[in-house]
Amino acid sequence: MTPLLTLILVVLMGLPLAQALDCHVCAYNGDNCFNPMRCPAMVAYCMTTRTYYTPTRMKVSKSCVPRCFETVYDGYSKHASTTSCCQYDLCNGTGLATPATLALAPILLATLWGLL
């Protein structure tokens, strides 16, 4: 073998192999769900979608996806939904903010502003 080919082979053997992403994959009628799984190699994102049927009733879905389209609200359907994506192992383990929590944010900011 030529020295250049030998050098290329040595360098390639030292490179780490691409690691598959680990995501929580589940569907749950309630606040949150956890089920860690190894995703296929082509997957680039962990996704969490929450569909709100009423302010207190929701469905949480978590999955592995090759592409992500984050949404805050789908105005065309009769149910509100939020979708978020992330790109590191088990990053979709935490839940998204619920509507009640989001409603408290302006009140908290106004209170803090009044204290300043």
UniProtKB/Swiss-Prot annotation:
Gene3D superfamilies named among the record's database cross-references: CD59
Topological category with respect to the lipid bilayer: Lipid-anchor; GPI-anchor
Biological process terms in GO annotation: acetylcholine receptor signaling pathway; regulation of neurotransmitter receptor activity; synaptic transmission, cholinergic
Range of residues in the leader sequence: 1-20
Keyword terms: Cell membrane, Cell projection, Disulfide bond, Endoplasmic reticulum, Glycoprotein, GPI-anchor, Lipoprotein, Membrane, Signal
Keyword Transcription regulation: no
Listed name of the protein: Ly-6/neurotoxin-like protein 1
Propeptide: 92-116
Gene Ontology cellular component terms for the protein in this record: dendrite; endoplasmic reticulum; plasma membrane; side of membrane; synapse
Comment field (misc): Isoform 1 is considered to be an endogenous 'prototoxin', that shares a N-terminal three-finger structure with snake alpha-neurotoxins.
Subunit comment: Interacts with nAChRs containing alpha-4:beta-2 (CHRNA4:CHRNB2) and alpha-7 (CHRNA7) subunits. Interacts with CHRNA4 probably in the endoplasmic reticulum prior to nAChR pentameric assembly. Interacts with KCNA2/Potassium voltage-gated channel subfamily A member 2.
Native organism: Homo sapiens
Functional description taken from the UniProt entry: Acts in different tissues through interaction to nicotinic acetylcholine receptors (nAChRs). The proposed role as modulator of nAChR activity seems to be dependent on the nAChR subtype and stoichiometry, and to involve an effect on nAChR trafficking and its cell surface expression, and on single channel properties of the nAChR inserted in the plasma membrane. Modulates functional properties of nicotinic acetylcholine receptors (nAChRs) to prevent excessive excitation, and hence neurodegeneration.
Subcellular localization: Cell membrane; Cell projection, Dendrite; Endoplasmic reticulum
Cystine pairings recorded for this chain: C23-C46, C26-C33, C39-C64, C68-C85, C86-C91
UPAR/Ly6 domain: residues covered: 21-107
Principal cellular location given in the protein's record: membrane
Glycoprotein listed as a keyword: yes
Lipidated residue numbers (GPI-anchor amidated cysteine): C91
InterPro entries: Ly-6/neurotoxin-like_GPI-ap (IPR051110), LY6_UPA_recep-like (IPR016054), Snake_toxin-like_sf (IPR045860), Toxin/TOLIP (IPR035076)
GO MF annotation, one: acetylcholine receptor binding
